[in-house]
Amino acid sequence: MGVELAFPKVVGKQVYGSLYDCDENVLKDTKRLEQIIKEAADVGNMNILDIKSWKIGEGVSVVAIILESHITIHTWPEYKFATVDVYSCGPHTSPLKAFNYIVEKLGAKKYTINEADRSSEF
């Protein structure tokens, strides 16, 4: 008779999309974008470890490393466009709530949303 091993389930929830007709002043503002990510992490019950940002032309890229994975915002103010990715491996988190918060704060008038279940069972 063999021994059956039970391994924990790995949770992976990803929400990402493209945001159109955003507030171009927010899209240019590195400090404001960093604050939005901090607030979104709170809304999604995530724990920020570090935030890095880079100004690229008029746009900004902000990457937050969270204990559970990451949150990113990349902006193109000249097109009033941004992309957002919220990925979490924490069963206690809500990437969807964090994503929706970012959409609201960037003032997107239109957006796409994609959800991926990246969980795996061993």
UniProtKB/Swiss-Prot annotation:
Catalyzed reactions: S-adenosyl-L-methionine + H(+) = S-adenosyl 3-(methylsulfanyl)propylamine + CO2
Active site feature: 69 (schiff-base intermediate with substrate), 74 (proton acceptor), 89 (proton donor)
Lineage: superkingdom: Archaea
PTM: Is synthesized initially as an inactive proenzyme. Formation of the active enzyme involves a self-maturation process in which the active site pyruvoyl group is generated from an internal serine residue via an autocatalytic post-translational modification. Two non-identical subunits are generated from the proenzyme in this reaction, and the pyruvate is formed at the N-terminus of the alpha chain, which is derived from the carboxyl end of the proenzyme.
Residue numbers bearing the Pyruvic acid (Ser) modification: 69
Site (Cleavage (non-hydrolytic)): 68-69
Family statement: Belongs to the prokaryotic AdoMetDC family. Type 1 subfamily.
Secretion signal, residue range per the UniProt entry: none
Cofactor note: Binds 1 pyruvoyl group covalently per subunit.
Name this polypeptide is given: S-adenosylmethionine decarboxylase proenzyme
Keywords: Autocatalytic cleavage, Decarboxylase, Lyase, Polyamine biosynthesis, Pyruvate, S-adenosyl-L-methionine, Schiff base, Spermidine biosynthesis, Zymogen
Organism whose genome encodes this protein: Saccharolobus islandicus (strain L.S.2.15 / Lassen #1)
Pathway entry: Amine and polyamine biosynthesis; S-adenosylmethioninamine biosynthesis; S-adenosylmethioninamine from S-adenosyl-L-methionine: step 1/1
Its EC number(s): 4.1.1.50
GO molecular function: adenosylmethionine decarboxylase activity
GO CC list: cytosol
Cofactor dependence: pyruvate
Role of this protein: Catalyzes the decarboxylation of S-adenosylmethionine to S-adenosylmethioninamine (dcAdoMet), the propylamine donor required for the synthesis of the polyamines spermine and spermidine from the diamine putrescine.
Matching Gene3D superfamilies: S-adenosylmethionine decarboxylase
Complexes and interactors: Heterotetramer of two alpha and two beta chains arranged as a dimer of alpha/beta heterodimers.
GO biological process: spermidine biosynthetic process
